[in-house]
């Protein structure tokens, strides 16, 4: 990932970061809201009407980063219900989204749509998404990693790692896979990074710190949960860590 001089991690609140990169989240609000309705809620007994909940800021941030670097390709580890991939696919310059998960595409899971419990597969969710841009997305299962290494080597502009958060070896292997698939100017985005100043719940922070100590990267911690929605719960010292071979701001 390049040979730029190592920098101290810069920390930004979400709205501050959006101002720096000239991104207006409201222009994407209607579309991403529709995606979040289907893919971002958990069962809530008290919820009678959909609203953008705490943490729904993430897809805006991922899409904004894709826009910032003029990305044409996006690789994701940890599909979940596809929130990130569907949102990034809406970016005009994006031509390819590849998303990898340990759960088969056809396997039904207990989840929620608009806070209401439902058992549904990723394949069935995909059919509910109305945006034509979803055709850009290719879904892969973990057993297809050798295929990805062979046919997608150095193909991606962004790797978004949002898979296992607790097993250090799995996270390290996710980094290795991402580096294989990224081109020389590609950036990595780590979800659920917690700074050393916080009470870390996940292994992500320690693994990323070790990775940063070995390389010559620019890094940015962007705090986002509760920064647009449910602002009374605004989170600090945690968010996504963006690692880049060049300066983003």
Range-by-range predicted roles:
Residues 1-27:
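N-terminal auxiliary segments of SAM/dcSAM-dependent transferases
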């Amino acid at each position: 990932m390049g040979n730029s001089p190592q920098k101290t991690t810069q920390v930004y609140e979400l709205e501050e970061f959006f101002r720096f990169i000239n991104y207006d989240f409201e222009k994407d609000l209607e579309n991403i809201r529709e995606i979040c309705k289907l893919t971002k809620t958990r069962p809530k007994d008290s919820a009678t009407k959909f609203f953008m909940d705490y943490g729904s800021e993430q897809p805006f941030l991922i899409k904004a980063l894709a826009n910032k670097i003029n990305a044409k390709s996006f690789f994701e580890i940890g599909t979940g219900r596809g929130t990130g991939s569907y949102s990034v696919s809406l970016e005009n310059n994006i031509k390819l989204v590849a998303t990898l998960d340990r759960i088969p595409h056809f396997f039904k899971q207990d989840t929620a749509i608009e806070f209401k419990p439902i058992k549904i597969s990723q394949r069935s969710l995909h059919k509910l998404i109305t945006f034509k841009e979803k055709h850009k997305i290719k879904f892969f299962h973990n057993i297809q990693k050798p295929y990805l290494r062979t046919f997608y080597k150095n193909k991606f502009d962004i790797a978004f790692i949002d898979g296992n958060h607790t097993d250090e070896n799995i996270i390290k292997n996710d980094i290795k896979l991402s580096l294989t698939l990224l081109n020389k100017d590609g950036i990595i985005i780590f979800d659920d990074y917690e700074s050393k100043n916080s009470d870390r719940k996940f292994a992500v922070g320690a693994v990323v710190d070790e990775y940063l100590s070995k390389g010559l990267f620019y890094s940015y911690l962007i705090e986002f949960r509760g920064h647009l929605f449910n602002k009374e719960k605004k989170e600090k010292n945690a968010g996504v860590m963006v690692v880049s071979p060049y300066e983003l701001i």
